Amino acid sequence: MKFKTLALVLLASASFAACNTMPAHPTMVTNDVVTGNNGMTLYVFDKDVAGSGKSTCNGACAENWPPLVASDFAMASEGGSADLTLITRDNGKQQWALKGKPLYYWANDKKPGDKTGDGVKGVWHVAKP
């Protein structure tokens, strides 16, 4: 019985520690641009309908525009703002959205501060607070 109790305590401690290593907020604002916690610029896609709860960027699109994916246990309240919500992607993963629009990185941005995806094909734009 002592072994089971110890095992449960260790499991609970490990789970709690894992939760505490997640960033407090998935995004931040840097120079009036919304970025991920890694400092990389985030973008919105004109073809995504705000508030639809869906992303229209899947497959090859998502390879070029990786979504800002949430952890499996994320809750919208963790976003730190009422403007940050979660949507469910076609593959079942959760993605962060700003004002109802899913957020994406641009694969060609190489370092924090890059904004090379702004205006691509006239439908990709830097996410603004």
Regions found by a protein language model. Give the residues of each.
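Short, linear, compositionally biased motifs with a strong N-terminal bias
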Residues: L10-A12
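Bacterial Sec-type N-terminal signal peptides, specifically the leucine/valine-rich hydrophobic h-region
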Residues: S15-F16
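Compact beta-sheet-dominated domain cores in extracellular/mature segments
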Residues: K4, L8, C19-P129
